[in-house]
């Protein structure tokens, strides 16, 4: 299968283009589809097109051609349109109507779930920003301090396990005159710096993007909402929400990995940083806004477990164990686990069934919403 997939890899970019066009078509007919978002996160579009191309080409060998690319484009374009649409209301609540964007990433279903479940776990008033730590622990209220300490512990353990010699062979910047302890400390601080730069820049990014997109959408796609990278949401949450999500998600992943070891799983998953950080930080941001610190801790922890266990099943079902595994983001350890089974056993009718099932979701959203406000939610209210 891998050789055939390699020969057909060029179809991935065709699938990506078709997915984007299909997303636009669904928006043009939004009166009927009830969809409002256009996914614009380029690297995510590439990852998703590549993954779904593998699924379809693996289980339906007869579609390793242009028709397979069309099937993949429609399938992934529908997913991108439908599940980014699910994040409109949660993001509008998070930004108090100021954002003018939705999320277009790999945990859109998780964000919707967090927004629904978090109020049942905790209280919004118990937000991370309202926590008062006693005595010297108050310094951890500053996200720079808390993130630096957490990353020092997290990266420190990993680097100590790998060993100084291995790290020197891996990193050319690790000079012979630098002590191993100082090297670990500097890397932890570097991560903190990068995170703060990311958080500081997101509002500027969102403001520029939404204004630019508005100029285009007013002419071509009136009322369309841009679905962008999940990191843009971090600027609308307490800074420590990101750190809490990362830490609790890591605990969940490590617990699940330990379970795989204890029960001698035929598939072993290694924690991947992208799902570990971006999925769980995003879940914590939305969970904290709706259910406070308790939800921001519990939901990323559960997500970490699902990422590992769902990823292990996906890697096994999709025959990827020998080829490096699975990227393990929440939606691809849940939604596309189900899609994989359906396509595996139902073939082409399975692809059609998945598309139809996803297109039903916005119809249910619309039926349960305030219909007068449905197409105005997510539109930016005011300038920053």
What do these predicted regions represent?
Residues 5, 28-36, 230-312, 316:
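Hydrophobic alpha-helical bundle architecture
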Residues 5-211, 220-231, 320-384:
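Signature of multi-pass transmembrane helix bundles
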Residues 158, 214, 287:
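Residue-level marker of positions within ordered structural domains that often coincide
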């Amino acid at each position: 299968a891998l050789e055939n997939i390699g020969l057909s890899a060029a179809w991935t970019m065709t699938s990506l283009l078709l997915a984007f066009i299909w997303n636009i078509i669904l928006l043009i007919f939004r009166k009927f589809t009830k969809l409002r978002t256009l996914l614009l996160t380029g690297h995510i579009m590439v990852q998703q097109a590549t993954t779904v191309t593998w699924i379809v080409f693996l289980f339906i060998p007869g579609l390793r051609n242009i028709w397979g690319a069309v099937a993949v484009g429609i399938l992934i374009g529908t997913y991108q349109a439908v599940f980014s649409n699910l994040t409109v209301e949660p993001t509008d609540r998070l930004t108090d109507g100021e954002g003018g964007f939705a999320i277009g990433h790999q945990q859109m279903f998780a964000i919707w779930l967090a927004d629904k479940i978090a109020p049942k776990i905790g209280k919004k008033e118990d937000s991370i920003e309202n926590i008062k730590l006693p005595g010297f622990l108050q310094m951890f209220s500053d996200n720079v301090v808390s993130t630096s300490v957490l990353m020092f512990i997290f990266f420190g353990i990993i680097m100590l396990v790998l060993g100084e010699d291995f790290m020197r062979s891996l990193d050319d910047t690790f000079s012979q005159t630098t002590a191993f302890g100082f090297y670990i400390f500097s890397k932890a601080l570097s991560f903190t710096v990068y995170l703060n730069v990311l958080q500081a820049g997101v509002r500027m990014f969102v403001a520029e993007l939404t204004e630019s997109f508005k100029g285009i959408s007013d002419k071509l796609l009136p009322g369309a909402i841009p679905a962008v990278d999940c990191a843009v949401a971090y600027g609308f949450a307490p800074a420590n929400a990101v750190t809490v999500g990362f830490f609790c998600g890591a605990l969940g992943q490590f617990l699940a990995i330990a379970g795989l070891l204890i029960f001698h799983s035929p598939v072993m998953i290694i924690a991947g940083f992208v799902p570990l950080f971006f999925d769980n930080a995003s879940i914590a941001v939305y969970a904290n806004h709706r259910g406070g610190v308790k939800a921001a801790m519990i939901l990323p922890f559960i997500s970490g477990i699902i990422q590992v266990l769902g990823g292990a099943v996906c890697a096994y079902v999709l025959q990827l164990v020998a080829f490096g595994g699975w990227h393990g983001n929440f939606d691809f350890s849940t939604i596309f686990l189900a899609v994989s089974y359906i396509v595996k056993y139902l073939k082409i009718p399975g692809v059609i069934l998945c598309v139809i099932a996803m297109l039903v979701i916005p119809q249910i959203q619309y039926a349960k919403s305030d219909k007068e406000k449905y197409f105005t939610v997510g539109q930016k209210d005011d300038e920053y």
